[in-house]
A protein has these predicted regions:
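N-terminal Rossmann-like FAD-binding beta1-loop-alpha1 element of flavoenzymes
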Residues: 11-38, 210-220
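Conserved Rossmann-like nucleotide-cofactor binding loop
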Residues: 21, 44, 160, 209, ...
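Glycine-rich active-site loop/strand segments that organize a redox cofactor
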Residues: 42-94, 174, 186-190, 229-251, ...
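FAD-binding beta-loop-beta segment adjacent to the flavin cofactor pocket
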Residues: 57, 324-362
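Feature captures the FAD/FMN-dependent oxidoreductase FAD-binding
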Residues: 79-152, 156-161, 278-288, 301
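Glycine-rich dinucleotide-binding loop and its adjacent helix/turn
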Residues: 88, 155-223, 229, 326-335, ...
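A Rossmann-like FAD-binding core segment of flavoenzymes
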Residues: 111, 115, 219-316, 320-323
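A conserved FAD-binding loop/helix module that cradles the flavin
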Residues: 350-382
């Protein structure tokens, strides 16, 4: 017990990821005067957000700012925006970058976490396990691998680095890897029209990212009829793909769905349902998607937006209790199931809900939702 008290007094809490949730967690720890180190794999804070910086969020400013972070920032003279729907770039510039600056050298950039365990204890060992600090193995962009000791670990690394493939069975379709140069797994920045104008693009997916991409391409097609767009859904019918419209809990999201339906009805977008990709082949500079039922689609570009999944590989030596379907903490799985809930109907969760059998280890943010696409920044802050 004496050793554990010493450890808690001396060692920092390590937060993995300097995205919105990781920075917010750090702000709460600073407010409680607890030492904290934030490890960010990217070259800048909020590196994942920067990759979709051109995309506009459907949450308003007040829902995108954590309370403890705001208190930390207000001490510097910062003023919180009160209305509007920012892009990812605006979120960084106005809030996330100033928050990272306020946290200062507590953040280490270019620090990729490759493993988390207990000092001198692998996953099997019970004896004295809870009395040992965590060991966090770090592979920096420059220099040799090192490890840190921590009193607690908060994994806020998100899911951005592990997108789902085009294959309908959750695995890459046959030939998908070989055709990787013709496929992208993020929402492209359509402000650069060069790669899409005058081409045929297939978008695979039914979520909000897919809707956002389809809308951008449809607007391009409206200006340039030589641009064609096909929207592929795995499900047999469109169902709730277009969202709740005026009844949507998130008005901006509802508006996206309404516009998407209008574009489909107007013929700017060709909607294909029940298309489950089994194989991807090349035909010159084009990709040919082959469905399980034998149908084919030929495209100049394929944008795969089928969701994300958590990277659990570096947590293999920890004792986790995750839902077998969602790969989320079991206590919250029923509340975030996308078959039942949408983003706006998910209740806030607390530390007790996110705790794991490994004491003092927590999954937070988008990663705590596993494969469920219903996470909102506001829910994470709460």
């Amino acid at each position: 017990m004496y050793r554990k008290v010493q450890m808690e007094n001396a060692l920092p809490v390590v937060v993995i990821g300097a995205g919105p949730q990781g920075l917010a967690a750090a702000a709460h720890l600073v407010e409680r005067r607890m030492p904290v180190i934030v490890l960010e794999a990217g070259a800048s804070p909020a590196a994942a957000v920067a990759e979709w910086g051109h995309v506009r969020l459907f949450s308003e400013w007040p829902e995108l700012i954590d309370a403890a972070a705001a208190r930390l920032l207000c001490a510097t003279g910062w003023q919180a925006p009160t209305a509007g729907y920012p892009t990812g770039e605006q979120w960084i510039e106005t809030y996330l970058a100033p928050l990272a600056a306020a946290l200062g050298d507590r953040i280490r950039l270019g620090a990729r976490v490759t493993g988390v365990s207990r000092l001198g204890r692998d996953r099997l060992v019970d004896a004295g396990r809870g009395d040992q600090p965590f060991t966090v193995h770090v592979a920096p962009t420059e220099g040799e691998e090192y490890r840190l000791q921590a009193r607690a670990v908060i994994d806020a690394s998100g899911t951005w680095a592990t997108p789902n493939p085009a294959g309908a069975d959750g695995l890459p379709a046959l030939g998908e890897s070989a055709a990787a140069d013709l496929l992208s797994y993020r929402i492209p920045d359509f402000r650069d029209r060069a790669g899409f104008a005058g081409t045929h693009t297939v978008v695979i997916g039914s979520g909000h990212s897919a809707v956002t991409a389809v809308l951008a391409l449809a607007r391009m097609a409206r200006r340039d009829p030589s641009t064609t767009v096909t929207w592929v859904l795995r499900r047999a019918t469109a169902g709730n793909t277009f969202g709740g419209g005026d009844a949507d809990e998130l008005p901006a999201r509802g508006a996206l769905g309404k516009t998407a339906k209008e574009y489909v009805d107007a013929g700017l977008v060709s909607l294909v349902t029940g298309f489950r990709v089994e194989r991807v082949t090349r035909a010159g500079e084009s990709a040919v998607l082959v469905a399980e039922d034998g149908r084919t689609l030929t495209a100049d570009r394929v944008v795969v937006l089928t969701g994300f999944r958590p990277d659990l590989s570096f947590l293999s030596e920890l004792r986790l209790e995750l839902d077998p379907t969602l790969q989320a903490p079991v206590r919250i799985a029923a509340e975030i199931d996308p078959n039942v809930h949408s983003c706006g109907s998910v209740a806030a969760t607390g530390a007790a809900d996110l705790a794991q059998p490994e004491p003092d280890f927590y999954l937070v943010g988008a990663k705590s939702y596993g494969r469920a696409p219903t996470f909102l920044a506001l829910t994470g802050y709460e």
